[in-house]
Amino acid sequence: MKKKYRIKKNEEFQEVFQRGASTANRQFVIYTLDRPEQPYFRIGLSVSKKLGKAVVRNRIKRYIRQCFLELKEEIAPGKDYVVIARQPVAEMNYAEVKKSLIHVLRKSGGLKKGGQPSHSA
């Protein structure tokens, strides 16, 4: 995923937390902030040390980034997304992570209307 699609700075995370809307399920919390002037979406990831050691946390982040990469045609542009992983994610495989992310993105309005993501895992 290219650098322009990532949220890295603390100030940017804080802005999304404070001004954005949150949606959650048992595995993820997603904060969404509209940025109409931005022709693409950006994502920021937050995976706490409570979820496991570095290997586990990095695997979770890879899974989430890969999901966004595969779903990029269906994800609404002009938004910033901050994804916070919760405890159950540590034991999930890629297909389960993707299904859960699609669910919470749909709930948050992050998927384009009528966009049916392919369920190939």
Curated annotation (Swiss-Prot):
Gene3D superfamilies: 3.30.230.10. InterPro entries: Ribosomal_Su5_D2-typ_SF, Ribsml_uS5_D2-typ_fold_subgr, RNase_P, RNase_P_CS. One of its GO terms (molecular function) is 3'-tRNA processing endoribonuclease activity. GO terms for cellular component: ribonuclease P complex. Its EC number is 3.1.26.5. GO terms for biological process: tRNA 5'-leader removal. Keywords: Endonuclease, Hydrolase, Nuclease, RNA-binding, tRNA processing. Coiled coil: none annotated. It catalyses: Endonucleolytic cleavage of RNA, removing 5'-extranucleotides from tRNA precursor. It holds the Pfam family Ribonuclease_P. RNaseP catalyzes the removal of the 5'-leader sequence from pre-tRNA to produce the mature 5'-terminus. It can also cleave other RNA substrates such as 4.5S RNA. The protein component plays an auxiliary but essential role in vivo by binding to the 5'-leader sequence and broadening the substrate specificity of the ribozyme. HAMAP family: RNase_P. Belongs to the RnpA family. Consists of a catalytic RNA component (M1 or rnpB) and a protein subunit. This is Ribonuclease P protein component. The lineage of its organism: Bacteria, Bacillati, Bacillota, Bacilli, Bacillales. The gene is rnpA.
